[in-house]
Amino acid sequence: MQQERTVKVSKYLSKHLRHQPERIGLTPDEGGWVEIDALVAAAAAHGFPFTRQELDHVVATNDKRRFAVEGTRIRASQGHSIAVDLRLPVATPPPYLYHGTVARHLEAIRAEGLRPMNRHDVHLSPDRETATRVGARRGRPVVLPVDAATMHRDGHVFHVSANGVWLTQHVPSRYLRFPAPH
């Protein structure tokens, strides 16, 4: 499968499993799962046909493991704007997690901390390298270390998704380390 096609199918899956399943007539269960055959049929009926083999390739080769397959069902691993209960267990985070952003967002983050925005949770990376890649999608990256151990000790709840993304509802700014102003 060509890389360009892989990216297109992956983006289509993300859009319709995370955000807009109803646009192609899908109704995920409370955990975000849909039947694979129904997804493939709905995509074809709405002008974006792909095969089960293409879907399997996208799931198997996605470096961020954005999708989970269980038997005959598929869901996005995290990042939903629709209501889902991923049933992720509570987890004890490492001492530090990281958030990738860009400089233009720092003022708002200083004032409000990290908020989920249009998602259900704030997404945190386990290492600086991943956070740098995340921030780079929107410009020159700025990586903010998160004092996850203190947050956890103070009662904040963390979950970790199947693809290693750490999730929490909010990160108050007092747990963030900001870069020195220039």
From Swiss-Prot:
UniProt keyword terms in alphabetical order: NAD, Transferase
Short name of any one Pfam family annotated for the protein: PTS_2-RNA
Signal sequence extent: none
Molecular-function annotations in GO: NAD+ poly-ADP-ribosyltransferase activity; tRNA 2'-phosphotransferase activity
Family: Belongs to the KptA/TPT1 family.
Stated role: Removes the 2'-phosphate from RNA via an intermediate in which the phosphate is ADP-ribosylated by NAD followed by a presumed transesterification to release the RNA and generate ADP-ribose 1''-2''-cyclic phosphate (APPR>P). May function as an ADP-ribosylase.
Protein name in UniProt: Probable RNA 2'-phosphotransferase
Designated gene of the protein: kptA
